Amino acid sequence: MTAKKVALACSVCGQRNYFVPENPKRTERLTLKKFCKHCGRVTVHQETK
């Protein structure tokens, strides 16, 4: 069975650029620095519902 995936959205433009498997043990929202192809730079991406 495949794991449910959650989206990581850019905090600047709001685009959902990345999808990661959901971890039920993690209660806080995931925050990572990733490259946003729409902004053209590295920005903070946060887990969305």
From Swiss-Prot:
User: What does the record list as GO biological process?
Assistant: translation
Q: Which InterPro entries match?
A: Ribosomal_bL33, Ribosomal_bL33_sf, Ribosomal_zn-bd
Keyword Ribonucleoprotein found: yes
Q: Which GO terms describe its molecular function?
A: structural constituent of ribosome
Q: Name one GO cellular component term.
A: ribonucleoprotein complex
Keyword tags: Ribonucleoprotein, Ribosomal protein
- Superkingdom per UniProt: Bacteria
- UniProt xrefs under Pfam families: Ribosomal_L33
In which family does this protein belong, per the annotation?
Belongs to the bacterial ribosomal protein bL33 family.
**NCBIfam families referenced in this protein's UniProt entry, alphabetically:** PRK00504.1, rpmG_bact
What is the name attached to this protein's record? Large ribosomal subunit protein bL33B
What species was this sequence derived from?
Answer: Lacticaseibacillus paracasei (strain ATCC 334 / BCRC 17002 / CCUG 31169 / CIP 107868 / KCTC 3260 / NRRL B-441) (Lactobacillus paracasei)
Higher taxonomy: Bacteria, Bacillati, Bacillota, Bacilli, Lactobacillales
